[in-house]
Amino acid sequence: MQDELNLEPAVVWVVDNTQRKTIKDAARFGEIEHVFTDVQYDDPVAHAREVLKDFREGDYLCMIGDPKLSAVCVGVLAQNNPGNEIKLLQFDSRTFQYFPVYLNF
């Protein structure tokens, strides 16, 4: 999908690089980038701030993996984008597809 504002492709920011879940369907929403990898982080909030500084309005956050890391990412995006919509991708286990969910803070 193209970002309506600047024609750059959207990015799907995958919270946790887990091998147990598939993200193949999420790629239809944009280019895949990982916020956290298998490395342990002393300060996950600082790491998420650094990685998500490039999050644009047309991007998505794919909340997969550790719920604490998902909460960190949503908190960082809410702080960095006050009043703007945050697009999340949620997995539907019946259809094996992701669908968008929209949040406004």
Regions found by a protein language model. Give the residues of each.
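Short beta->alpha connector loops
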Residues: 67-69
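Long, low-complexity, Lys/Arg-enriched
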Residues: 1-60, 72-105
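Short, surface-exposed polybasic-aromatic patches that bind anionic ligands, especially phosphate groups
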Residues: 63
